[in-house]
Amino acid sequence: INLGFNSEIGFANTKARLRMITLYQVAASSNGLVVGTGNKVEDFGVGFFTKYGDGGVDISPIADLTKSEVKSIARELKISQKIIMAEPTDGLWDDNRNDEQQLGLSYEEIEKAMFDENSINRKKYLDIRKNNIHKMNAIPVCIINKKIKSN
């Protein structure tokens, strides 16, 4: 019986969730926290993370910083240029595709589109965001009618 469990995106998201489980085990073993690496552009601009995967963290110290702000701070901290300029990738795909290949826009293009309504990439940015907005919103709670609850 083929149940159709051959979704490429499903396998990639499973890898991200297994990473999260591993990070929480390490954190629990060391009485620590899982620290998020998502920034304002990636996580809250376009929602480019796996729900209950790399989005599952205890604290997000750079979530209010854009990608360009993170790079600027990294330069101030004298972080290696090789690290600052490294190609963004989630490492979840067998073909080693990078974030830009997955999103269809670079982070520079996304950042510009986020803040410039006249950006040539504004529509594409908004489309990506619309598809992922469910990850950025609180989980919907079903309110049960009191009459039903009391039965």
Describe the predicted segments one by one.
Residues I1-R17, I21-Y24, A28-L33, T37-V41, ...:
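ATP/NTP-dependent adenylation/nucleotidyl-transfer catalytic domains that generate, transfer
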